[in-house]
C-alpha cells in the first residue's frame, strides 16, 4: 500500500525536481535606464529586439545553464491601446521591476494536461515571437498558469518553435559566465499558507521550510526542490506590503547562482535556508537582485 502511494506521487515529485526556469522578467517604462543600471552593477545585457506585440522590446543576460534575465520595456511611441493589452502593463508603466517568470517545457501539451488534472487553471498554448536585431526570427508558444496575470504567481510555460539557443544565446554563447543562472524567484504573497497550499497542489510538493528574515522584512517559505521562495510581509509598513498594494502577488526579487561572487559588490548580505545571499544596491539598481554564495 505504501509502495503504491509512493509510485502514485512519483510523477509529481519528479516534475517538481525538474521545474526549470526558462527566464525571468524585469519591467520598466524605458529600456535604456534598465540596461544602464544593470551594467553599472557589472552585468551588462545585450539588446534582444522588439516583440511582435507592437508594445515592448527587450534586452537580456543569459547564463551557462540556459536561463536568462530579461529586461522588458515599452517601445518608443508604442500605441497606448497595445500597451493596455499587455499582461504586465502596470509593471511597465510603473517601473515595477521583477514582474514574471517562465518555466521551460519540452512537452507543453502534456504539462497543460497534468495541471488540468490537478485542478489548476491553465490556458491553451498561444504562439508568439520576436525578431532579433540581426533579423533572426524567433517563435515560441506559451500557456498561462493560474488566474493571475501571466507568470506572476505561477510561472507561465514556454516551448520554443525555433531553436532555443537562438533565443537564449544571441551571441551564440552565454552573455555572462560569472553566474550559473537564475537560482531563485522570490514571490511576494499576502497569505503565505494559502500560497503554499496552491503550489503544493500544482506541483505535488512536500511541506515547506520556513524562516523569518527581518532584513528582507518577510516571512519566507522554500518549497521542496522548486526554485521558488514565497515571501509574506512582516508588517503593514513593510516595503513588501506597499509593493503588493501596487502590483499584486508577483515576483519581488530574483536570486542568481554565483560562480565568481568576488567580482561583485554586495550592499547587504543575509542567509536563507542555510545559503548565504548577497544583495546588490536596490536603490541604484532600481529593483532587488541577489546572488547565492557557493560554499566551496
Where in this protein do the model-derived segments appear?
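Bacterial N-terminal signal peptides
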Residues: 4-13
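Histidine-centered divalent-metal-coordination microenvironment in nucleic-acid enzymes
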Residues: 60
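Glyoxalase I/VOC metalloenzyme domain signal
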Residues: 17-21, 26-45, 63-296
Amino acid at each position: 500500500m505504501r509502495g503504491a502511494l509512493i509510485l502514485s506521487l512519483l510523477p509529481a515529485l519528479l516534475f517538481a525536481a525538474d521545474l526549470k526556469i526558462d527566464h525571468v522578467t524585469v519591467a520598466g517604462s524605458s529600456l535604456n535606464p534598465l540596461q544602464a543600471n544593470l551594467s553599472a552593477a557589472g552585468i551588462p545585457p545585450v539588446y534582444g529586439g522588439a516583440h511582435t506585440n507592437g508594445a515592448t522590446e527587450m534586452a537580456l543576460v543569459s547564463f551557462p545553464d540556459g536561463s536568462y534575465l530579461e529586461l522588458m520595456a515599452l517601445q518608443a511611441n508604442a500605441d497606448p491601446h497595445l500597451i493596455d493589452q499587455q499582461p504586465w502593463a502596470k509593471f511597465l508603466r510603473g517601473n515595477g521591476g521583477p514582474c514574471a517568470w517562465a518555466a521551460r517545457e519540452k512537452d507543453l501539451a502534456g504539462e497543460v494536461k497534468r495541471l488540468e488534472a490537478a485542478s489548476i487553471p491553465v490556458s491553451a498554448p498561444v504562439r508568439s515571437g520576436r525578431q532579433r536585431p540581426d533579423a533572426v526570427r524567433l517563435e515560441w508558444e506559451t500557456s498561462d498558469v493560474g488566474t493571475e496575470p501571466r507568470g506572476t504567481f505561477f510561472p507561465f510555460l514556454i516551448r520554443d518553435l525555433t531553436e532555443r539557443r537562438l533565443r537564449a544565446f544571441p551571441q551564440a554563447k552565454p552573455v555572462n559566465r560569472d553566474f550559473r543562472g537564475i537560482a531563485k524567484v522570490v514571490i511576494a504573497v499576502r497569505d503565505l499558507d494559502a500560497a503554499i497550499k496552491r503550489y503544493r497542489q500544482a506541483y505535488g510538493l512536500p511541506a515547506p521550510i520556513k524562516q523569518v528574515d527581518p532584513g528582507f522584512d518577510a516571512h519566507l517559505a522554500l518549497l521542496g526542490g522548486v526554485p521558488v521562495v514565497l515571501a509574506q510581509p512582516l508588517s503593514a509598513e513593510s516595503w513588501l506590503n506597499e509593493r503588493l498594494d501596487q502590483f499584486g502577488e508577483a515576483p519581488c526579487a530574483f536570486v542568481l547562482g554565483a560562480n565568481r561572487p568576488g567580482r561583485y559588490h554586495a550592499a547587504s548580505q543575509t542567509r536563507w535556508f542555510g545559503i548565504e545571499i548577497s544583495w546588490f544596491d536596490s536603490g541604484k539598481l532600481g529593483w532587488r537582485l541577489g546572488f547565492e554564495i557557493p560554499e566551496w
